[in-house]
Swiss-Prot record:
GO terms for biological process: ribosome biogenesis. This is ATP-dependent DNA helicase DDX31. PROSITE patterns: DEAD_ATP_HELICASE (PS00039), HELICASE_ATP_BIND_1 (PS51192), HELICASE_CTER (PS51194), Q_MOTIF (PS51195). SMART domains: DEXDc, DUF4217, HELICc. The gene is Ddx31. Residues 628-644 have a biased composition (Basic residues).
Amino acid sequence: MKRQAEATKRKHQVSSDAPPAKRRSEISSVLAKKASDKETQRTFKGSTHKTFPPKKYLDSIGNGRQEEKPCIKTSSLFKNNPEIPELHSTVVKQAREQVFSPEAFQELDLHPHLISTINTVLKMSSMTSVQKQSIPVLLEGRDALVRSQTGSGKTLAYCVPVVQSLQALTSKIQRSDGPYALVLVPTRELALQSFDTVQKLLKPFTWIVPGVLMGGEKRKSEKARLRKGINILISTPGRLVDHIKSTKNLHFNRIRWLIVDEADRILDLGFEKDITVILNAVNAECQKRQNVLLSATLTEGVTRLVDISLHNPVSISVLDKNCNQPNPKEVASIQLNSFAIPESLDQHVVLVPSKLRLVCLAAFILQKCKFEKNQKMIVFFSSCELVEFHYSLFLHTLLCHSGTPTSEHLPSASWPLKFLRLHGNMEQEERTSVFHEFSHSETGVLLCTDVASRGLDLPQVTWIVQYSAPSSPAEYIHRIGRTARIGCHGSSLLILAPSEAEYVNSLASHKINVGEIKMEDILAVLAKDDCFKRRQRGAQKSRASGPQEIRERATVLQTVFEDYVHSSQRMVSWAKKALQSFIRAYATYPKELKSIFHVRALHLGHVAKSFGLRDAPRNLSVSAVKKASLKRPHPRRKTQRKQHLVPAEVLHSEHSSGLEGGATKCRKQGKQQGLQVAPSKPGPWRE
């Protein structure tokens, strides 16, 4: 009894010495927070994130209104990252071409009205080097294989001879005669661009009618135009093959010109069979004609096409300053490992850990397009899903933070951001609208797939950013070729992970030099904008400075992205789909680059961070994605897919005729090449 009384007394003493209940609650809260922070740091591998109770904060307008907002603990962007290696690439002598020549168009034997149109409408007086070498040869009626750097004026090099020869025919061309010239191009956008150039050249010669055929347009309308008559026909291969098989009014008995522009790209996209069908159809009705093949790069596939389409051709290469080469095969084999790059093009590379890729890309866009005047940028991605995801993400985050500058370090004004997108899953009407809008815009950021990498002349593009590394040096050349066109200055940036640094040496082996930009220099732009300054409790600004401040602002920007992605289950699902698309595209690099871009080298948790995901999806693993991407479709279900095509599938590929699903076409091409291609896997062009 006595012991029980003493125990009760000690209990009351402890109780009387303890702090009040409110104080005890605060102490326990602080201890719990510290324990939570330690646990989060200890278990961080992209899998543990703590959610804190709601707290009050002042809104951005500053009107004193208080709201409840959950504070989510995000893992550090600057911890557990792989070490960034030093680049020790060998400096090589790049192949150069002289873009302009001193000769003017007046020196050529052209119709005076055609020369006047070139000078006044196209605003060109002097020829480029490739035009100087090509136009006289083509006016002589010779077949030709033309190779020159991107942006050197190859389109005009064949358009001028075609218009000159057709207007000079003694018997005046009638619209009802049908095609006299056939031009094949790989993409719809290039078809529109070539059609626009021909249309301008034909202003003095109204009796010659140009026309364009491409997937995505109404086949009935195209049949009506063919019935009325088209004298210069520009088309994508898939659509033309469809009309050859189904349109009775399409005849080639008067064909005098057959031109294949971007010949290597047409073959890369699997159109070799379509080209064979077209050549057979033309040969069946007209044996005598002039054939021209053009491209910025020559491949082994082009040499095969030379064998079946050209007769005693002239090889024109500005790079080697050789004309009238007797054997185009030898020229092609010599030039396979070297590429001509415009002298006015500056090339850069930056090594960025996977977790920081998204923040680094956003910071670079802000640096060039918000804080610098008259900047126009194209960002290349590996798939349509990546384009759509980043377009939506930047549209709802960066635009909301690109208002009036508040920092004293800002220039007198910042420039509004404008985002556009272009890829093969868009409807043709929207693609055409975006193409024209970006072409006529002075500023803007175009997010796109490789559909925009070939032949397109997009004026005043100052920066090319390759967020997804190209699958070949030739693809790299065509991407950066969208800038520094016709003597203008331009720059390019290639974003690589530390494990991909060896790709720089791969480019150097093809005589391509790139200079390194440090990631810290790109992220430093965030110090110019107080929108990304971290705020502590009580709406007090962080007092950090230097590198620490930049890290804090990068974390704030990453938090903005993650908050948007996790704002709805739909966005989370969209981010996961984009992540899966990225990994599948990553698995399609050719075998010679597998040692650099191997899917097993990816840290899925870190890669997920670059998609605004706080956790790597549990049902996503490297082996699962690889297995799904290589899985062959069930033979019994193949027929059902053909019978139940939805409208979205009809317009799946920018290169198709528009009458069959892109996935079905990929599978057909895969069978011809002995490959196993799944419906959801990106094609060999990874668009």
